[in-house]
Amino acid sequence: MAFPYLKNRLAVLILGAGIGWMGSCSPAPTLPDPLMAGWNGKPVCECLHEDEQLRVLRCTFPPGGGHDRHFHAAHYGYVIEGGRMQITDKNGVRIVDVPSGSSFNNDGVEWHEVVNIGDTTSVYLIVEPKGN
């Protein structure tokens, strides 16, 4: 071949284009955090406090209301008003009776969706530390 360097450059261009194409055909999904996620286009959570160290959200779920698919960073939760919630995540669907006054914490949630399938409004406080 008269121009061997051209063959190498062409191979790099084709390979590079192929890699870029593959990435654009299957982009990683970006999910909202709990504050940005809503239900039927309306907010579910409100920010009560935010500073350099933490953020505190109050999330309210009337009967039949829910929270569209979202992720959570590490957080602590406190249940002000409990209820019966249907939770969908990568493990499937489960129904949980959440008592008022209970609490929970975890290192984060890849994704989940929740729906209040009970008869009363459920209210949660979510405390998210920053910088962890």
List each language-model region with its residue ranges.
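C-terminal motif of bacterial Sec signal peptides marking the signal peptidase cleavage site
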Residues: W21-S24
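Bacterial Sec signal peptide processing site at the extreme N-terminus
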Residues: S26-A37
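Glycine- and acidic-residue-biased ligand/ion/polar-headgroup-sensing regions
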Residues: H72-N91
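Short acidic-glycine-tyrosine-enriched beta hairpin
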Residues: N91-V109
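Ligand-binding loop in jelly-roll beta-barrel domains
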Residues: V109-G131
